[in-house]
Amino acid sequence: MDTDKLLSKDLLSNGILLKGLKELGINEKAHNKLSKLLNIYMRELKMFNASFNLVKVKDDEELIVAHILDSLSAWRFFYNETKNTESKTSLNNAETKNTNEALLTSEPFYIADAGTGAGFPGVPLAALFISLGNLDVKLSLIERMQKRCTFLENIKAVLQLNNTEIIESEAEKAPQNKFDIVTCRAFHTLDKHILQTLLNLAKPKGKLFLYKAAKEKINEETELIKKEGLNYKTEKLDVPFLKKERHLLIIEKP
């Protein structure tokens, strides 16, 4: 990454970022806080990148479009899933006799970002949920490389991401059967080992949210999913200013 060019024009960066947030349909009341958090995140990326080799982009626009906006392009699917769970919790609470008991039965919504690397999509999603005021969503960023975890711990502190924890671990050794959603952008091809590893992280009835490219390129992966007898669907993602095709592959754990 050319660090001399990266974020050299904050106004330009903000323009692209804010337009992207608007095109994604994110609540405009959250734009100010979210854009501030994301700009700090990008500045920290610039500062650490030369030593930590976090991300390869040619300029600030590519960083915003191909990584920040791409990470946020699936936000509605995450958000709707948290609301579906919230509705079920509210229904269960309504059946309890004691209000205090009802409050105690509410549980956070857990999201894991497996192989998060520099924090994509986990950090943008964490910043989004904080900006939306949804503090019940908890994110775990799973990364095996110590230097990247050091960077992520710094990001957590600087951005005050109180909804986020950093787990230095291989995905295979991370907490099992814990997460409502397990997401990742890191794996190019989904094979049987990776699929099982990700499923092991999810709760029963939990879901995998996998960022993928063109639909025809994931046909081989969906054949594997069919053989495993899993329910799945593919959703098209519209990433502002990105000319490449993007999809979200959603797989449900039995």
From Swiss-Prot:
It comes from the Bacteria. S-adenosyl-L-methionine binds at G115, F120, A171, E172, R185. Keywords: Cytoplasm, Methyltransferase, rRNA processing, S-adenosyl-L-methionine, Transferase. SUPFAM superfamilies: S-adenosyl-L-methionine-dependent methyltransferases. The keyword Phosphoprotein does not apply. It is an enzyme of class 2 (transferase). Its main location: cytoplasm. One of its GO terms (cellular component) is cytosol. One of its GO terms (molecular function) is rRNA (guanine-N7-)-methyltransferase activity. InterPro entries: rRNA_ssu_MeTfrase_G, SAM-dependent_MTases_sf. Its EC number is 2.1.1.-. Residues 84-109 are annotated as: Insert. It is found in: Cytoplasm. The keyword Transferase applies. Belongs to the methyltransferase superfamily. RNA methyltransferase RsmG family. PANTHER family: S-ADENOSYL-L-METHIONINE-DEPENDENT METHYLTRANSFERASES SUPERFAMILY PROTEIN. Specifically methylates the N7 position of a guanine in 16S rRNA. NCBIfam families: rsmG_gidB. This is Ribosomal RNA small subunit methyltransferase G. The lineage of its organism: Bacteria, Pseudomonadati, Spirochaetota, Spirochaetia, Spirochaetales. The gene is rsmG.
